[in-house]
């Protein structure tokens, strides 16, 4: 199933985590809605929009957390054989900046995923 509605224009604030996740998913042909709001709401809104979701990381899935005031999203770039994952994201280590990081298999279990 493809999800094309509301996916043409990136209305998220530039260089925020949601802006990057929207942009990256469009780049890899897996668009998400531009109307899901703050990162903390993405998992709920994805489910409401009939996206497949779960607790297991997959390549190009959105990794989502409700921690903090706004929550956080990142994009899974790689799932390694040992279960660790590499994610790309904005606004995590430094305000409005891009970074990648590797999370252990144990750490990766603490997040929701939008496929």
Predicted regions and their residues:
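Secreted/periplasmic proteins that engage bacterial cell-wall peptidoglycan
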Residues: 3-80, 84-90
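Aromatic- and glycine-rich peptidoglycan recognition patches
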Residues: 80-115
